[in-house]
Amino acid sequence: ATFVGCSATRQTQLNAAASQAQTYAANALSYLNSHTSSTTRYTTWFGTFVTSRYNTVLSHFSSISSNTFSSYTFDCTCSDSGTYAFVNPSNFGYVTLCGAFWNAPVAGTDSRGGTLIHESSHFTRNGGTDDHVYGQAGAQSLARSNPAQAIDNADSHEYFAENNPALA
């Protein structure tokens, strides 16, 4: 990885987060490839299963899993305590980390690894998701009310990938 304004400690933490994100992405893609009809895990985060929407999610995770997270550029110069991270969708592979990121666990709900999935889904080449809602409750509600937006929501991708608590 390339680091901008990151201490040695934070570089180590980012290497671990990148590794976790790579695992999450690979596992999400593997799951989608082996579950091509409705499952609790899919419908919880993306709503009613229809093939066209499934194919969109599959495309997103296929792209995300082909990223090498350890080759991203990580910028540690943001100190906003209320923000995890942000990207410019057209500037592929450049992620700015903020205060909330450093307080997150490496894996699990709202984790560092999951944050990198969230941010990578915003990159245009990975699907260009938006932020329609934040949080698990919001994402689950969106899946029920508007699956078309759920498949375009970054947190929905993060929670599907983190799969915590685990859903079949």
From Swiss-Prot:
Cofactor annotation remark: Binds 1 zinc ion per subunit.
Q: How is its activity regulated?
A: Inhibited by chelating agents such as EDTA and 1,10-phenanthroline.
User: What are its GO biological-process terms?
Assistant: proteolysis
List, alphabetically, the Gene3D superfamilies matched.
Collagenase (Catalytic Domain)
Cysteines engaged in disulfide bonds, as pairs:
6-76, 78-98
- Which keywords describe this protein according to UniProt? Disulfide bond, Hydrolase, Metal-binding, Metalloprotease, Protease, Secreted, Zinc
Listed GO molecular functions?
Answer: metal ion binding; metalloendopeptidase activity
Report the cofactors. Zn(2+)
What does the UniProt entry say about where the protein is found?
Secreted
Give the positions of the site Transition state stabilizer: 134
Question: Which reactions is this enzyme annotated as catalysing?
Answer: Preferential cleavage in proteins: -Xaa-|-Lys- (in which Xaa may be Pro)
Task: Provide the binding site for Zn(2+).
Answer: 118, 122, 131
Q: Name one GO cellular component term.
A: extracellular region
In Pfam terms, one family for this protein is Aspzincin_M35
Please list the coiled coil stretches: none
EC numbers for this chain: 3.4.24.20
Matching SMART domains, A to Z? Aspzincin_M35
Annotated active site: 119
Identify the PANTHER family for this entry. Answer: NEUTRAL PROTEASE 2-RELATED (PTHR37016:SF3), PTHR37016
Q: Which family does it belong to?
A: Belongs to the peptidase M35 family.
* Protein name as it appears in the record: Peptidyl-Lys metalloendopeptidase
Q: Which organism is it from?
A: Pleurotus ostreatus
From the broadest rank down, the organism's phylogenetic lineage runs: Eukaryota, Fungi, Dikarya, Basidiomycota, Agaricomycotina
